[in-house]
Amino acid sequence: MVELETTIKNRAGIHARPSALIAQTAIKFASRVYLEKSGNRINAKSIMGIITLAASFGTKIKIITEGPDEQQAAEAIKALFESGFNEELG
């Protein structure tokens, strides 16, 4: 299992477009991929699950991966967060 922490850097937070990018990236991996906010863990391969986190700018998110390509999956998801989803950063 790999656990990484990141912070929402884009001003708009996690809305439909970033949720889709996260899910599309997570689906590429065989590992289970989860996002966790304040103890609420969701499946990162589910756009609706990601949206329900209601993660706004500055929110801390934990990325959790389990499986054969867990390190690559965690790093790919973290890279999306670090890029601010190519949106306006705060």
List each language-model region with its residue ranges.
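Compact, glycine-rich, soluble single-domain proteins
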Residues: 7-57, 80
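C-terminal structural segments of small proteins and small subunits
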Residues: 56-90
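Intrinsic-disorder/low-complexity, polar/charged segments enriched in Ser/Thr/Lys/Arg/Asp/Glu/Gln
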Residues: 1-5, 60-62
